[in-house]
Amino acid sequence: MRNYLVISDIHGDKAGADLIQEAIDLHQPERILLLGDVLYHGPRNDLPNQYDPKAVIAFINSLKTPVTAVRGNCDAEVDQMVLNIPITADYNCFPLGTRTLFLTHGHVYSPEHLPVLKAGDLFLYGHTHIPFALQAGGIYLLNPGSVSLPKENHPRSYGLLTETAFTVRDAAHHKYQSIVFEDAPAEL
C-alpha cells in the first residue's frame, strides 16, 4: 500500500527538518509530499528557535526519498536556485487509487477556494499551521499542520497518507488526528 509523508511549513527550521528525518526513519514513506514554505519564516511568523535555512537546504537536497513539492507564499525564486527539487508550482495533482490527490500550499487554493474536484477526492494543503482532517461536500480537506511553527496551541506535526486514510502525528510521533476515507477498508 502506498505510504506518503505529508509535511508543510518548515520555514527554515532545523528542528523541523530533524522531525521530518525522524518521521522518514520511522515510517519509511515511498514519497514525501511537501506543501510549501520551505526556507523563509515570513514576515508574519516569529523566527523559529533553530532557524537555519542552510541546514534545511542541505537536508532537503540530501533526501533519498522522492519529493513532490509545491510553492508556499513564503517561497521565492531564489529558493528554487538552492534546492534540487522543483518548488515553483502552485499545485500538483495525481491519482491515488480511484481518487485525485490535489496538493497546494493553501494561499491560492484553499477550502474556501477549491479547484474542481469530485466527491472522494483529496485536497492537501498547509499554510494555516493548523492540522485538519475533515470531509466537507464530499471532498477530504487534509492539512498536516506545521513541523516548525504550529498555531492555536497545536503541536508541531506532520501527516501520513495512504489510499485509505490520513493521519496527523505530533512531534512525539503519536496519532493526533485521523480520518478513514469512505469506501476504504479500515487500516490495521
What are these regions (language model features)?
Residues 44-46, 79-82, 89, 113-114, ...:
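Short, well-ordered secondary-structure micro-motifs
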Residues 183-185:
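Asp-based, Mg2+/Mn2+-dependent phosphohydrolase catalytic module
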